[in-house]
Amino acid sequence: MKKVSKLLMTGLFLGTLILGGCSNGGNTSDSTAKENGGANTDEKVKVSFWAAAVSEDRQEFFDWFAEHVTEIYPNIELDMLGVPGSLDDYRQKLDVAIQAGTAPDITNDFRPQLVANGYYENLNEYFDNWEDKNLISDELVNSNKTYDPTGEGLYALPYGSQPWNMWTRVDWLDEINQEIPTTWDQFFSDIESLTDKSDNRFGMAIRGGAGSANTLEMLMYSYSGITNYFDDNGKATINDPKHVEFLQKYLIDAYGNYTAEDDLTKSWTELASAFQSGRAGFVFHNLGSGKSMAEAFENDTTKFAAAPFPESKEGYIVHAGLMPLGLSMNSESENKDAVWKVITLYLSKEVQEKYGELYGEVPANSEARDTDFFQNTQYMKVGTDIIEGKNIKFNDTPYYLPSYTNVQSDMEAQIQATMSGNMTPEELLNEWAEQLETAKAEYEEWAN
């Protein structure tokens, strides 16, 4: 547990150091016209926006958005920077800029550490007075508020989400006269029926490599129907007996029998390959893979389809809490009203349509969700229904814990040990619960 503690405290300490050096070159005594984004003058106002992990096609979108801002607001010039590389590269660049006082007005990587340390502006007042606020998904807004220790502050305006789903080979199911399974019992029956080892064909593929813990968490809670990660006494629910039962079926009984042996080390890339090349009947991922799935199967939905997770033991579908994300405003920005105009323009129907189709995300804006691509593209329609909460319950995934992803990383080796028979499901989940409880207790002590 010392590892989790050290990671948590180090992250919070570094965040404090970063904010300590943050001036952003700001001058809060600038003119009222500048504070209002030049709303009442012809003065040109510059707003800076850094976007994370921008590829060539994404850069084209952001270049278009910069032009669109000036088209709608002639007095606002958007200084748009698409940062290539990984999310870690972006975070390193941003942290250095914060310390140097050169951080941008808008960022699109929402982090709880920067909420707690005051880097982000609280957007509650802006949002409450925004005429289009009712178009934005309540579930996404509430999810973003979990990054505030009080649960009340909105520090990023959500622009979309990538719900998780079950990718299915519907043509394989047709061969055994089955529909897409809507219960876990049917799912486990189907993977057995679909498996033909002599043909190197398996009912499903398990993500045993990088990212395994994140996927497994979602599936366990989907199976059990539990929607809270902690009880009233701060005890973790991840080691609930229903989760032990699921791991027995999924990691022990299915692995090696209805899955390939090399699933032990598969990351998403290998999982997608197994599904698309006809070696696995089911895989679990998010809608970000929708475009590659559609291309691999040439948009032939008689061969593949997205589906919600099967119903839980309680008779309803459980989806992980939607990941907090959105556009945040630098609390040291000199032109906050202009910044807000840019942020809300990003949430407009036209921009949301373009963004959602490019990134494979369901828009936060309901008008954009009602457009053709999101209503008539099979996998996006599934995601849209999830975001709108149709027959879905969301659990309270603790994304707000600074060490949450570190706990997941620690568990990946233990998951492989369980698949290999060197650890029992009970041992895995008890250790997982202990780490989560420690992370929560330390967070609450720090937050209070």
Predicted regions: what they are:
Residues 1-48, 71, 430, 434-448:
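Short, low-complexity disordered leader/linker segments with a strong preference
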Residues 67-72, 77, 152-153, 175-176, ...:
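Extracytoplasmic/periplasmic substrate-recognition and gating elements
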Residues 68-139, 174-182, 274, 278-282, ...:
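Extracytoplasmic "Venus flytrap"/periplasmic binding protein-like
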Residues 74, 136-148, 304-308, 357-410, ...:
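Long, aromatic- and glycine/proline-rich binding clefts that accommodate carbohydrate-like moieties
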Residues 110-165, 179, 188, 215, ...:
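Hinge/lid segment of periplasmic solute-binding proteins
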Residues 124-139, 179, 206-208, 225-246, ...:
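Short, solvent-exposed loop/beta-turn-alpha elements that line the ligand-binding surface or hinge
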Residues 147-159, 164, 186-236, 243, ...:
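Extracytoplasmic/periplasmic solute-binding protein
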Residues 191-193, 233-264, 309:
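Glycine-centered hinge/linker elements that transmit conformational signals in sensory
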